[in-house]
Every structure is written in C-alpha cells, then in structure tokens.
C-alpha cells in the first residue's frame, strides 16, 4: 500500500513544496560528494515539509527525489553511492537543524502541544484540522516531529 501524504505528488505540488531556496543551495555548496549533497538536500526539504529527519532517502517519494536532484544538476542514481555512516548522518541532521533553525522534539513539547490542541478541540473535532494545527504549532515553535530512529 502506497503511503499517503497531506500533499499531492503531482509535479506542481512537488515543485511548490520541495524547491530549494538560494540559501539552501549556498548551504549545500561546500559538500563535494554528489551523493552526500543530494542526501543532505533531501533531508533538508523533507524536514521543512514533513517536519522529520529522514535516515533512508529511499523512503522519500521518487517524484521528490527527481525534483530535488534536478535542482542540483544530479541524477537520482547518485544516491546508490551514498555511504550513510551514523557519524555522517548525525552531521547532516545537525547541519539541517541549524540551517532551518529548528530543534528535535523534547518531552516538554508533548505537554505544551497537548495544551495547545485541547484549546483547538473546542473549535473543531476534525482530525485533519487538528493535525494541521499541530503542524502549525511545531513550525511556530521550531520543533521537529518526535521520531523513532535507530541512530541515537
């Protein structure tokens, strides 16, 4: 079963959400290895849209990988050369968090988000609207989603 997202994988939506900014391109420029540059770009755009850091780029939709690789004048196949060691992955995650000015989820965030959503529940019972409200809160606070990762 294909994963569903809150956005469409049609070309226009992918372009709108996953286009690298000038600052993003400048951030990626120092990376000499094509595979690492594409991986870091994917982690960056995915964190911006989905609010999570992705360890395995194959979990990202092909349309997104293709769009981002074109912006870097690379072929998606360069990812086959990626040697994503834990230390390199951690460095990528830290660099992306710093570039986006966000931080990882902390236990205290659960209580704050819960209080925020309780206030919203009185206005809507729509799960989709509550999900959007939670995402808006995370963007405003500058926090990424809590995630289960094997690289702690």
What are these regions (language model features)?
Residues 1-152:
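Long amphipathic alpha-helical coiled-coil/heptad-repeat bundle
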């Amino acid at each position: 079963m294909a994963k569903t997202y809150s956005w469409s994988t049609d070309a226009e939506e992918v372009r709108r959400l996953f286009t690298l900014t000038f600052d993003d391109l400048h951030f990626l420029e120092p990376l000499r290895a094509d595979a690492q540059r594409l991986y870091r770009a994917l982690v960056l755009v995915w964190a911006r849209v989905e609010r999570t850091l992705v360890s395995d780029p194959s979990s990202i939709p092909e349309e997104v990988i293709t769009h981002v690789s074109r912006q870097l004048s690379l072929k998606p196949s360069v990812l086959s050369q990626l040697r994503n060691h834990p230390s390199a992955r951690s460095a990528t995650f830290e660099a992306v968090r710093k570039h986006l000015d966000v931080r990882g989820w902390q236990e205290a965030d659960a209580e704050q988000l819960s209080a925020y959503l309780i206030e919203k529940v009185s206005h809507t019972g729509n799960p989709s609207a509550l999900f959007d409200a939670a995402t808006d809160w995370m963007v405003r606070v500058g926090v990424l989603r809590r995630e289960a990762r094997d690289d702690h």
